[in-house]
């Protein structure tokens, strides 16, 4: 959300905003996902493909969980940051791009760097304007606003008629510790919007990580 806000508040707002979650990628496909590949570069590469860097040319690329990038690929990421150049897998030529990088991680990159798991030159290249965001459990005042924003987002995305959440359902969210941080809240709201038959989400619609097999609370007719 912060990355999107940075992009939307900048001169690049009308250009692409591309995201990639490193933690969700197998290491074997990570380089191709970031930088692209040419046809025949590896088994299964039946056609050439642009990577996330090329997709974000002129705009912003948000790299989530950047601390999970292996050392070998960190070298290529550093070159992209330093010189604005990338090289697709299986291609000798380099391409020059204009992409602003916004990176996030839940790991201590300085400690990882000291342990040899993260390049120091890449660390300092990324650490230009650090922004520390407390976990959701430490800023519960944001839960209501985020919940409404996610409801609006997913209602539009999936064409669902959901337009709000009951007070009791919101209270259940406010009490939850959210070990999965904002992503856990987003997933819970997305699932609720998809599965409900109501216009107002109730406690019966909200399922949280520690209680996947039962509903949260009891139905309440009060509305937020």
Stretch-by-stretch model annotation:
Residues 16-18, 47-58, 62, 70-76, ...:
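AAA+/SF3 P-loop NTPase mechanochemical coupling elements
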Residues 40-47, 83-88, 111:
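Short gly/ser/thr-rich secondary-structure transition/capping motifs
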Residues 67-68, 78, 207:
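Catalytic acidic motif of RecA-like/P-loop NTPases
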Residues 10-15, 90-100, 108-211:
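Nucleotide-binding/hydrolysis machinery
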Residues 213-220, 224:
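Conserved small/polar residues in nucleotide/adenosyl-binding loops
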Residues 1-43, 54-70, 135-140, 188:
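Conserved post-Walker A coupling segment in P-loop NTPases
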Residues 4, 31, 35, 74, ...:
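A short, noncatalytic alpha-helical element within ATPase nucleotide-binding/catalytic domains
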